[in-house]
């Protein structure tokens, strides 16, 4: 029997389905990614403008070059020390050991990995700079009824406090800004 995916989590419109010409329904926003450029505070690096990323050793999440916009893409296009990787588990140690100047990650993912790697109370060792506006996340489905069911459930847990408990459980403290 052919397996079919009912739901995917995505932050880009129809990014998995646009070539198939299939109607895709997007849910309400589940949470926002807070993409930040993060460096060691003690290094006092300057990277307030996009062109500042052209000469730094940068480790970013996979597809950052596309997600972070054309100005960022231009800045890192000729940077031989720019890397994108799916595995964000290594980035905390790479940054802490000064093997990279900057990592680009959702702040909440970084903080979670930081606590797992280096223990609690280390977030103050780093500087967090906003690189783009928050990125809304939602689910995508080919089934309108499934989307509506999901939205009703999401609304309910947001209203009854369960949503906030989930954020705290999995992200310790969900931080909505860099």
What are these regions (language model features)?
Residues 1-6, 88-109, 116-117:
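Short helices/loops that flank or line small-molecule/ion binding pockets
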Residues 31-36, 120-151, 155, 174-178:
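Periplasmic-binding protein-like
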């Amino acid at each position: 029997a052919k397996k079919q995916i009912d739901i995917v989590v995505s932050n880009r419109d129809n990014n998995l389905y646009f070539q198939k010409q299939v109607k895709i329904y997007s849910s309400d926003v589940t949470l926002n990614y807070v993409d930040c450029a993060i460096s060691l505070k003690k290094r006092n690096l300057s990277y307030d403008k996009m062109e500042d990323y052209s000469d730094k050793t940068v480790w970013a999440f996979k597809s950052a070059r596309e997600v972070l916009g054309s100005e960022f893409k231009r800045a890192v296009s000729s940077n031989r020390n720019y890397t994108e990787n799916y595995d964000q588990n290594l980035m905390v140690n790479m940054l802490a050991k000064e093997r990279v100047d900057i990592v680009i990650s959702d702040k909440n993912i970084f903080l979670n990995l930081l606590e797992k790697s280096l223990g609690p109370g280390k977030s103050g060792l780093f500087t967090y700079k906003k690189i783009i506006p928050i990125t809304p996340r939602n689910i995508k489905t080919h089934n309108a009824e499934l989307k509506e069911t999901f939205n009703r459930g999401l609304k309910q847990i947001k209203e009854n406090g369960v949503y906030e408990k989930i954020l705290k459980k999995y992200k310790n403290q969900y931080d909505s800004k860099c």
